[in-house]
Amino acid sequence: MSKQKGKRGEREVKDLHNEFFIDQGLDIRLERNQMQSAVGGYDLVGLDFLAIEVKHCEVFQLTKWWAQTMNQMKDGQTPVLFYRRNRVPWRVMMIGCVINSDKQPAMIIDIAVDDYFRWLATKLRSLKSED
């Protein structure tokens, strides 16, 4: 049951991303990492700058999940952890900056899914303008 719940969670988060990309008019699609059990890696692939891990589990182990997310990312990637329990909205943990007068220290942040997608839209626009 737990593996099925995990796969279902991965599909939900993949679909959230793909709906977002369609709404933004972007030709990007995320897929589940089918090789993760054999060779490791994060759960969703398709954007090289993100390492997305998904946890849909009743036994809450946020510290362990975050460590796994950090360990599976590659240099230059942003670690992103989507997590939730049954009947609770998805939450997102990632590295972000909190504006604090003249300094913007990077730290672990926990945000709502809508805020994550606002960040992702801004990030994709900035990457496009660099091309």
Each language-model region and where it sits:
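Catalytic phosphate/metal-binding cores of nucleic-acid and nucleotide-processing enzymes, i.e., regions
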Residues: 1-131
